[in-house]
């Protein structure tokens, strides 16, 4: 088989305006990573867009989800309910903290976590105190039902909105429904 002559990019870089200026500024001021004026501005604009009080820019969506797991207090051996149809970065941080993912089936309407399956899972594992909800392919899950179930069981919601930046549920931007939320500014997490 002959090798491809050209690369096929998932998302080729596009420059439409002042991107090169901002990249050069970051390079010249030696603020290429996690701090600096450009990062502060990204955080401000993101918080404004999502309608939340604060946003913290990290290196990747996985890092954001890992921070969420730490903030939620997951300890070794803790079971954590997770959406079963998602990118592995949704679940890997649970394992990084020593937690045990328990996968919750998806439902037909949105392909996201099934509230009925979540309720049944709480019957089997009433000790679970963290639920990781992901919105697949830009489609929000059934947040009202999931929040009500989690509230009844005193469970923290970690919202993985990596695939749903710009999507809303009942007029509210995803990335604001959990106790801890992670969004992504990349074209696709998978």
Task: Describe every region a protein language model picked out.
Residues 1-32:
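N-terminal "arm"/small-domain region of PLP-dependent enzymes with the aminotransferase-like
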Residues 35-79, 93-95, 103:
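Phosphate-binding glycine-rich loop
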Residues 59, 132-134, 182-184:
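Short beta-strand segments
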Residues 70-152, 156-161, 168:
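PLP-dependent aminotransferase-like
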Residues 176:
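Active-site nucleotide-sugar/metal-binding loop of Leloir-type enzymes
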Residues 186-190:
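Conserved small/polar residues in nucleotide/adenosyl-binding loops
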């Amino acid at each position: 088989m002959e090798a491809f002559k050209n690369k096929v990019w998932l998302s080729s870089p596009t420059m439409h305006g002042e991107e090169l200026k901002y990249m050069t500024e970051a390079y010249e001021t030696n603020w290429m990573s996690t701090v600096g004026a450009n990062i502060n501005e990204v955080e401000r604009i993101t918080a404004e867009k999502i309608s939340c009080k604060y946003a913290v820019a990290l290196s990747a969506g996985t890092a954001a989800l890992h921070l969420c797991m730490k903030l939620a207090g997951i300890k070794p051996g803790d079971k954590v309910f997770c959406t079963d149809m998602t990118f592995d970065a949704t679940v890997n941080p649970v394992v990084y903290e020593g937690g045990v993912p328990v996968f919750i089936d998806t439902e037909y309407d949105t392909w996201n976590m099934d509230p009925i399956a979540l309720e049944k899972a709480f019957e089997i594992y009433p000790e679970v105190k963290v639920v990781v909800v992901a919105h697949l392919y830009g489609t929000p899950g059934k947040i009202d039902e999931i929040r009500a179930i989690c509230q009844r069981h005193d469970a923290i919601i970690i919202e993985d909105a990596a695939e749903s930046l710009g999507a809303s549920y009942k007029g509210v931007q995803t990335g604001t429904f959990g106790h801890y939320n992670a969004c992504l500014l990349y074209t696709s997490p998978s």
